[in-house]
Each structure stands twice: as structure tokens, then as C-alpha cells.
Amino acid sequence: MSLSEGRRSGALRSPKQSYTMAFNFNWALFDVLLKYLEPRQGEAILDLGCSRGFYVRAMEAYTDGVVGVDISEASLKGAVSQRVKYGDITNLEFGDASFDKAYSLHTVEHIPNLRQFFAETARVLKPGGLVIIVYPWEPFRGFQAIVAAIRQYKNPFMARRIHLHRLTPVGVARLTEGTSLAHVKSKLVLALGIQYLTVLCKEG
């Protein structure tokens, strides 16, 4: 299935939900993800923090080996793909070197223990495997969560409860120190909003 066919078919719909289910699908961001991830049929690809699995469902057109993991039971009850599984992405239940590639879209800013997240990501990736991390550009922590904070808590100052970290490529590089993940590139991307994209590769 091509991207244009997917759009025409209406395969992906984004109902209005609470914040935990609100980040459903962004075609522009998916285009960017495909460019850097370069998925191929048969590859085992892991979506880290997949929410309801809209990106998992879209990725199924490129490989039958995609799996999504999310810890939100509310999101999983409304999952749109059977490849979505419940789990903690800082304590994954997969064996070492289980995946060819991985990606995480607007999830890392919510994770309390990021060093453990990157260590687990490195563990389940095969040597030479890529991981794409997308996270918000913010002048201050919580900037891009203000609207969500108003919607969810009726209080813009609760944005810092939603975004636990203000991340930059330099910060991500520091968090991956001591793991087998090497920095490949980082850039700002415009895809219905400004965000960072970082590409990491497992050495070995």
C-alpha cells in the first residue's frame, strides 16, 4: 500500500480522545519516519510507546514484522492493530537482539527513566540496527504540552506533569552514553509542528 492509497482509503482515522490517546497519526511525520527508517519486508521493527497503534498499522504495509508496545491500558483497549502489545518500554519482554529497527514518536519526553529506556532499546536491537527517536522542540519544558494540559487538567501549568523532560540532541547523546547506541544524526523537522528527529545505530 502506498502512502497516497492509504490516505484515499481512509484507513487511518483519529477520533478525539483524552491525552493518552490523542497522538494518533500524522501523515507528514510518517513520511519523515519512512525516509530515515527505510523499512523492508520481513524486518522486525518495534514501535516503542505506540499508543493505539496507528503507526503500527501503517507500518504493516511495509513489513509483517512490526510490533508496538505501550503501557497505557486505555490506549490498548482502543488499539487499531492486533500487533499492539501491553508492556513497559523500560523493561521489555523481548529477547536480546530481537529487532532489526525501532522507532519512538513523541514518547521519550514522558518517560521517567530515560537511561533505562535507551539501555533496553539497545538490548533488543540487533547489531547495526537503527532507532529513530522523535521528540518535541521546546524553548522550555512543557511548551508543546500546554494545549493538552488545558484540555486534560484545565490548567496550562500542568504541562510539566505531561512532559517530564525538555530534550535536545545533545541531551539524548548524553543519555545514550554507556550503551551500544551511537549517534548518527539529528535534525529539526517540520511535520505539523516543530520536532527533533535523532537517528541512533547499535554498534557491534
Predicted regions and their residues:
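S-adenosyl-L-methionine-dependent methyltransferase catalytic module, highlighting the catalytic core
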Residues: F54, A58, P112-E120, L130-G204
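Active-site acidic short loop of glycosyltransferases
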Residues: D96-D100, N113, P127
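Short catalytic micro-motifs in class I SAM-dependent methyltransferases
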Residues: H106-H110
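Conserved N-terminal segment of class I S-adenosyl-L-methionine
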Residues: M1-N91, G95, K101-L105, F118, ...
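Short glycine-centered segments of the SAM/dcSAM-binding site in methyltransferase folds
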Residues: A44, G128-L130
